[in-house]
Amino acid sequence: MSQSRAPAREPSETPSQREQIRSHMKMVIQQLEGILKELKDVAHELREVVGQIDKLTSDLELDLDADDWTVATASSTSSSERGLCEAFRLDFLGQDSLSDSWDFCSFLESSSRRSARDDTKPPPTTASVYSQMNGGLPVPNGPLIITPDSSSEEASSSTHSQSQKTSRTAGTRERVRFSDKILYHALCCDDDEDEDEDEDGRDEEEDKLDTDSERSPLAGSPVPPLPELYNCREPPAGGSHTIPRKDALNPGCRKKLLRNSSTQTVSDKSTQTLLPYVPAKHRNKDL
């Protein structure tokens, strides 16, 4: 029992230790009292300095408005009776500061609305861009999703039909797509050496047809004969009175037709008429 109660017993403090603690507390209290006295002396000196400043600045006349006061002016004009809190107090709830903050908030809201409108606008499509480039008018030959081959006959036929369907307004120019063959024959000269050799035999047949047409009773009509168009078609199998097929054309005559179509102007192709090609030899004979 004595061994279990032994650790519970605490050694009683000696009177010497208590006296040491009391002496330490008295020393701390004395130091705090000395600090308070020093602070009072500093405050008294500051008041004296402020009084001297007021005496020196009493001759100066400073007309300051309440709106122009700042922290520096408030501290310089403060007297000894005013405390530090009154000198450095800022009026954050004034009317001017509230109005400025309200204007700034409204500016932020307007800018956010403008940015939201810009984000909601869809990007311009290619059709609208091409219409703006043409002065707001629709472009007949604009970007197409599916375009035929440039060397095929579908390209030339489709572009020609589109140019006839669309009405051309004044002051606009249409873009016409030429096939590779038309461009080649448009850049080359009309009378090629290779074609002249092939056309020698055909010229004789055309002369015979011209003489036959002169003997006919319709020779005096104003419509000129078109032997070359009939000669371009293949000879019919059923006879001379059968109607020739539309697609039965010789390759040489097809080149002539393409070459004649290339002589039309690019600006207004829809108003031009298709004229037959007459070689230079026949022109000299007619003259």
From Swiss-Prot:
InterPro entries: Largen/INSYN1 (IPR027997). It is found in: Postsynaptic density. One of its GO terms (cellular component) is postsynaptic density. GO terms for biological process: inhibitory postsynaptic potential. Residues 25-58 form a coiled coil. Residues 259-274 have a biased composition (Polar residues). Keywords: Coiled coil, Synapse. Pfam families: DUF4589 (PF15252). It comes from the Eukaryota. May be a component of the protein machinery at the inhibitory synapses, probably acting as a scaffold. Belongs to the INSYN1 family. This is Inhibitory synaptic factor 1. It comes from Danio rerio. The gene is insy1.
